[in-house]
């Protein structure tokens, strides 16, 4: 049984004859029973209000709603013995099913199905009540009339590993009602309209998008704002803009970046690392010759035709000449392609390690076409000859276009591996990769090939396949994407969806007589179309879920392809695939089809979260989210296990067998896809739980009775974030090397990069709230000191336990920060930018100064109006009312109200989820600047304070640490603060004293550390209108975060 699921009393119908043998319990519960909360707005099958019973002209239809709801024409949840609406309004609930005239010709199948569903409903109801009684006996929570009659239909789930009690009574708080509710109706989308705006753009932020937590979390907004603001002159770093002219208007921006670049290059150990530093710094400055501009051009080139009105011919007469367009394309392909042997090596690597995860082509047809087109050049062994023949010219060009993208993807999948520790490819060595790189020009040429065919008007399976691989390039390429910018890959996926429906991919190919006729179509195209559609539904669903946009209703499109609600839908699909296989012994292809179908099922399940959180009219029950969580987690555990690779071998001698090696490679691809599916699941659960928590945080100041929900989702968010960190750490520490080869892990690291921002920011927000709770509790202890108030002991116990919890969470956050720095910083540009911000934050956290900087910002005076306006329309921070910021934060922070038992429970759950070593502290980088020159001519020296394998951490001291972080303390301790207040008169001093009194992490004195280098002295910086050194984060190119010239 699934906890928090809802089994509604069924209604009879002739079409209700679904099988009672589910392939998957989760799918049986997920698709045969609609998710609670989605019926009203997102289901096309919601029952319409019933007409009067006196209409004899209509056939008899038994109504299963209660009399009160039927009379008021209101949707009834059909709970027994009383529906939710009647309980809410105190009405008498009467179900008169037995009194209604039965249908003239009743359906036996419908009756049997109805009785079976009734049985499941009452069984689920009984298990729910039994669970409540057991919990009441254990004293963990109290029952209430609302619990008994609620529409949630909870049932226990023994598979959930980290189950936390949803609600339990808050003792000692008179504002909270006696007895707790376990459900409430909420609305996230309408209640929290969120927009990022500048003078050049506007963008709505959806509840499940990456930026929602940054924009919606008031704690994080204030922290980020305190980092943006300079503490000496109350000015903001101006270069947070997409306007490249800022480097000319403020030359110090470019100068500081070049100093950072020089320092980082000195720490690089390989040429690859140096190239990445050059590329990333050029991209931040937006040089005209940088790869980023090329990438933008690549994306935009898909939207226009570069060949005018000339299009490729499909055949030419024997002995005739090709068109100029075709000849030019042939010449370009021959010029760019490497030798035939190298092509084969890249292609075979793709087949072995990439294709199982991205199965968008029909391999046999593709290989047959290439074998008739590409040949070794007898005059030049390093080149190939392309012979097009006289027929099927367009299909051959399409396959050439596919080849170009495939070669790039094959190169990309192995290019950024650490070859000193990575598994060795049977086909590609580091020498081959270095000698024969595949540049981005391959993608551009592929797009020109498509444009030459007028691809928007003349779509086919090959063009769809090529577009899917182009999407894969933009989605998985480490250079693509940006922190705080939503990478517009969904533009490509939307085009693919549009073209796919135009050629009928959304219907099973057996529906079309032309496709099943051997005289008009290749039989192998049938299964190709099937796997293409599954892939498209998966891609579009993932895009919509990750970015929080309105989904394209893939579940309705799947209805024309296959009845996905059927528990045996996988069996039906696989039978169709087997029936159309040209080689019935092709077990690899069958296996790929099966796994692709499961991945599409997961994408559809996850889309329920998007639909739920995007509800605008009305609201949804909180138990709907719990229902979705449970069914998705069960489905993931059942269908995406991580299987050891050696399980396919009987003994060690089999490991040398090529068939066994091929089988292990397929399993490794499945494991890598399973792993990133697990990350995807946890990521969306985290974003959902944080969105719900932030919703309750905004309401709790007005309604104290929702404290149990606030507490629950604070804990759930914490556990979701730690669960993701646990996955990251296990992967980076090599605990999955027995199951996932590094050659198939390109998609894993990409999904980790996608999840990293949400994970780190969520955990940081939790740490900020705990830190403020410690401050609030300690303040209360000081007020009560000298009295005999019995609460002092409890308050001190809370402070101690919260301090332990804070240190554990900070260690977890710092650990994943270091892992991301070592493995991702110089591979993924979004991580490079995000960690530049976190360099400052982590430095503050190490010194215990997260709140120190916030308190200092609150004391500022005479802020520039441009700063106030900019931060208001982008982050939503009201700096014109900053004197009330701290009061508002303390008012909405109810973490201090957690009981000692609550804190103990959270601590226990954290220890179960992730092992935090109390003595594990990441290295503190110290930079030798004794020569007095900015960054000096000498190589900066680093001191490691722990024994670790993080050899690359020497490269992590960005100028952010040099500028703002390393000097942050000394700057704050130099006399009075801006605005005239002394340090002793600010809340900071009190916070420092509290830190010392509660044995929290003290603020480390930086007097013995590095001095601020010449050229970055605050006095010199203040002479300019915008003082900001690099530590002020003046090198971000948030394209829509800050406008170019706010007046």
From Swiss-Prot:
Domain remarks: The 9aaTAD motif (residues 1034 to 1042) is a transactivation domain present in a large number of yeast and animal transcription factors.
CDD domains for the chain: fungal_TF_MHR, GAL4
GO molecular function, one term: DNA-binding transcription activator activity, RNA polymerase II-specific
Miscellaneous comment as given in the Swiss-Prot or TrEMBL entry: Present with 92 molecules/cell in log phase SD medium.
Name the record gives this protein: Oleate-activated transcription factor 1
The UniProt record lists the keyword Zinc: yes
Domain of life: Eukaryota
DNA-binding region: 66-93
Lineage of the species this protein comes from: Eukaryota, Fungi, Dikarya, Ascomycota, Saccharomycotina
Biased segments, Polar residues type: 144-155
UniProt subcellular location: Nucleus
Organism: Saccharomyces cerevisiae (strain ATCC 204508 / S288c)
Keywords, in A-Z order: DNA-binding, Metal-binding, Nucleus, Phosphoprotein, Sporulation, Transcription, Transcription regulation, Zinc
């Amino acid at each position: 049984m699934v906890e928090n699921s809802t089994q509604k009393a069924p209604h009879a119908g002739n079409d209700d004859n679904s099988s009672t043998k589910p392939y998957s319990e989760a799918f049986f519960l997920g698709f045969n029973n609609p998710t609670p909360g989605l019926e009203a707005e997102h289901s096309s099958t919601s029952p319409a209000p019933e007409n009067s019973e006196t209409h004899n002209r209509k056939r008899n239809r038994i109504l299963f709603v209660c009399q009160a709801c039927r009379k008021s024409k209101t949707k009834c949840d059909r709970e027994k013995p009383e529906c939710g609406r009647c309980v809410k309004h105190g009405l008498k609930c009467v179900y008169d099913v037995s009194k209604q005239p039965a249908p003239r010709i009743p359906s036996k199948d419908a009756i049997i199905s109805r009785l079976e569903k009734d049985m499941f409903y009452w069984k689920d109801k009984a298990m729910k009540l039994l669970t409540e009684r057991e919990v009441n006996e254990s004293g963990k929570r109290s029952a209430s009339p609302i619990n008994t009659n609620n529409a949630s239909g909870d049932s226990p789930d023994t598979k959930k590993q980290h189950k936390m009690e949803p609600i339990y009574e808050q003792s000692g708080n008179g504002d909270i009602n006696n007895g707790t509710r376990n459900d409430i109706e909420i609305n996230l989308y309408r209640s929290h309209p969120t927009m990022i705006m500048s003078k050049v753009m506007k963008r709505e932020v959806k509840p499940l998008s990456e930026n929602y937590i940054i924009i919606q979390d008031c704690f994080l907004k204030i922290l980020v704002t305190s980092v943006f603001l300079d503490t000496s002159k109350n000015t903001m770093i101006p270069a947070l803009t997409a306007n490249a002219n800022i480097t000319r208007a403020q030359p110090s921006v470019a100068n500081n970046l070049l100093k950072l670049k020089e320092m980082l290059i000195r720490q690089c150990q390989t040429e690859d690392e140096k190239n990445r530093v050059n590329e990333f710094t050029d991209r931040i400055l937006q040089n005209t010759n940088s790869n980023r501009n090329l990438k933008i051009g690549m994306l935009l080139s898909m939207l226009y035709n570069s060949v005018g009105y000339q299009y490729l011919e499909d055949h030419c007469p024997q002995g005739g000449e090709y068109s100029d367009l075709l000849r030019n394309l042939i010449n370009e392909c021959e010029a760019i392609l490497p030798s035939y042997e190298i092509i084969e090596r890249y292609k075979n690597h793709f087949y072995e390690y990439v294709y199982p995860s991205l199965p968008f082509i029909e391999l046999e047809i593709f290989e047959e076409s290439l074998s008739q087109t590409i040949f070794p050049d007898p005059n030049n062994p390093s080149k190939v000859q392309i012979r097009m023949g006289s027929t099927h010219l367009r299909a051959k060009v399409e396959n050439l276009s596919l080849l170009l993208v495939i070669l790039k993807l094959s190169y990309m999948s192995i290019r950024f591996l650490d070859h000193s520790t990575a598994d060795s490819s049977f086909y590609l060595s580091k020498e081959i990769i270095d000698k024969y790189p595949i540049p981005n020009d391959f993608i551009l040429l592929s797009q020109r090939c498509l444009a030459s065919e007028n691809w928007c008007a003349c779509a086919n399976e090959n063009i769809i396949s090529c577009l899917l691989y182009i999407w894969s390039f933009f989605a998985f390429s480490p250079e693509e994407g940006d922190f705080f910018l939503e990478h517009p890959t969904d533009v490509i996926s939307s085009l693919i969806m549009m073209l796919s429906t135009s050629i009928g991919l959304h219907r099973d190919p057996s529906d079309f007589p032309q496709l099943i006729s051997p005289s008009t179509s290749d039989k192998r195209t049938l299964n190709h179309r099937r796997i293409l559609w599954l892939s498209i539904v998966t891609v579009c669903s993932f895009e919509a879920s990750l970015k929080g946009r309105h989904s394209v209703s893939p579940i309705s499109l799947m209805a024309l392809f296959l009845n996905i609600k059927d528990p045996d839908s996988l069996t039906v699909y696989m039978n169709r695939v087997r029936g159309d296989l040209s080689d019935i012994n092709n077990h690899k292809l069958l296996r790929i089809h099966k796994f692709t179908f499961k991945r599409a099922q997961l994408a559809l399940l996850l889309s329920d979260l998007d639909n739920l959180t995007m509800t605008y009219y009305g609201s949804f029950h909180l138990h709907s989210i719990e229902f979705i969580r449970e069914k998705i987690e069960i489905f993931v555990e059942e269908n995406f296990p991580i299987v050891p690779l050696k399980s396919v071998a009987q003994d060690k001698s089999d490991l040398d067998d090529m068939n066994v090696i091929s089988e292990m490679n397929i399993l490794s691809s499945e494991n890598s896809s399973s792993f990133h599916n697990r990350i995807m699941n946890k990521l969306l659960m985290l974003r959902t739980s944080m969105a719900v928590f932030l919703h309750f945080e905004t309401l709790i100041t007005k309604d104290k009775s929702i404290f149990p929900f606030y507490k629950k989702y604070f804990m759930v968010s914490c556990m979701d974030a730690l669960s993701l960190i646990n996955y990251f750490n296990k992967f980076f520490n090599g605990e999955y090397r027995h199951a996932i080869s590094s050659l198939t892990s390109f998609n894993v690291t990409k999904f980790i990069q996608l999840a990293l921002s949400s994970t780190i920011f969520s955990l940081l927000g939790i740490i900020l709230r705990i830190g403020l709770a410690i401050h609030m509790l300690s303040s209360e202890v000081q007020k009560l000191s000298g009295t005999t108030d019995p609460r002092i002991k409890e308050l001190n116990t809370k402070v101690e336990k919260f301090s332990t919890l804070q240190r554990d969470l900070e260690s977890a956050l710092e650990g994943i920060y270091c892992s991301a720095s070592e493995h991702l910083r110089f591979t993924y540009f979004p991580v490079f930018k995000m960690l530049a911000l976190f360099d400052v934050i982590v430095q503050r956290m190490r010194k215990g100064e997260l709140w120190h900087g916030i308190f200092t910002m609150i004391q500022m005076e005479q802020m520039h109006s441009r700063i106030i306006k900019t931060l208001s329309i982008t982050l939503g921070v009201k700096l014109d009312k900053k004197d009330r910021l701290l009061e508002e934060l303390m008012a909405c922070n109810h973490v201090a109200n957690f009981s000692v038992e609550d804190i103990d429970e959270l601590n226990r759950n954290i220890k179960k989820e992730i092992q935090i070593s109390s003595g594990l502290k990441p290295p503190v980088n110290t930079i030798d600047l004794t020569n007095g020159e900015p960054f000096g001519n000498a190589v900066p020296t680093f001191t490691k304070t722990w024994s670790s394998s993080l050899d690359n951490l020497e490269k992590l001291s960005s100028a952010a640490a040099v500028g703002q972080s390393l000097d942050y303390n000394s700057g704050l301790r130099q006399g009075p603060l801006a605005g005239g207040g002394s340090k002793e008169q600010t809340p900071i001093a009190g916070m420092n004293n509290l830190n010392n009194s509660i044995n929290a992490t003290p603020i480390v004195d930086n007097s013995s550390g590095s001095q601020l280098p010449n050229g970055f002295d605050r006095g010199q910086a203040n002479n300019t209108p915008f003082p900001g050194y690099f530590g002020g984060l003046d090198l971000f190119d948030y394209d829509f975060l800050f406008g170019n010239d706010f007046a």
